[in-house]
């Protein structure tokens, strides 16, 4: 295996590593699992038919997965994972967004020690839909989900237009960001 080069051998090694990690998690040999990117084409086999390791881990370990990406400057959770862009608006529901906000809040408290995390929620459409001119998901799905989460005690704010949110540096005002897609 050559590092950084996709190959069937590298895919098999990645799948074996993921299977071993699941065994170790089940045997309580691990407290946490951090994954790195995989080459989704190389890893496909009769034993691995998932669009990513997030889906594999959910199938093997059960539960509803929250994909989260972290750096020193940013923590980001994702509502939808590994689906075509054309399917995102059909996959978004108020309940799914509320669930992801609950999961993200729980992780921020348990894993990062943030007592009352503030979460920014990004819009799906450009300019946060511009009042329905560029899409209705913000008004019919995302904003009601943010309001419901807030009523449950989650400090969720938005939806914010994704393009301007990062360019303006507003992400620094929050402990995490919830985006609609990966």
Predicted stretch roles:
Residues 32, 64-66, 75, 155:
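Proline-centered loop/turn at the N-terminus of a beta-strand
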Residues 43, 62, 81-86, 90, ...:
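A broad detector of the eukaryotic-type serine/threonine protein kinase catalytic domain
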Residues 45-72, 150:
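Short, acidic/small-residue loops that bind anionic groups at enzyme active sites
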Residues 1-52, 95-180:
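Contiguous, glycine/small-aliphatic-enriched amphipathic segments in soluble metabolic enzymes
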Residues 69-99:
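Ligand-binding beta-strand-loop-alpha-helix segment within the catalytic cores
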């Amino acid at each position: 295996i050559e590092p950084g080069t996709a190959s069937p051998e590298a895919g098999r090694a990645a799948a074996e590593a993921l299977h071993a990690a699941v065994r170790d998690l089940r045997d309580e040999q691990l407290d946490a699992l951090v994954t790195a990117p995989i080459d989704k084409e190389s890893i496909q086999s009769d034993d691995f038919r998932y669009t990513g390791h997030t889906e594999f881990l959910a199938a093997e370990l059960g539960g509803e997965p929250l994909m989260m990406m972290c750096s020193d400057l940013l923590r980001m959770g994702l509502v939808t994972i590994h689906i075509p862009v054309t399917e995102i608006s059909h996959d978004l529901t108020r309940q799914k967004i509320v669930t992801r906000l609950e999961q993200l809040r729980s992780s921020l408290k348990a894993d990062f020690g943030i007592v009352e995390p503030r979460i920014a929620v990004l819009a799906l459409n450009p300019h946060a839909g511009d009042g329905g001119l560029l899409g209705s998901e913000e008004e019919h799905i995302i904003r009601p989900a943010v309001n419901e989460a807030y009523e449950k005690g989650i400090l969720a704010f938005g939806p914010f237009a994704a393009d301007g949110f990062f360019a303006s540096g507003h992400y620094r005002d929050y402990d995490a960001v919830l985006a609609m897609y990966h």
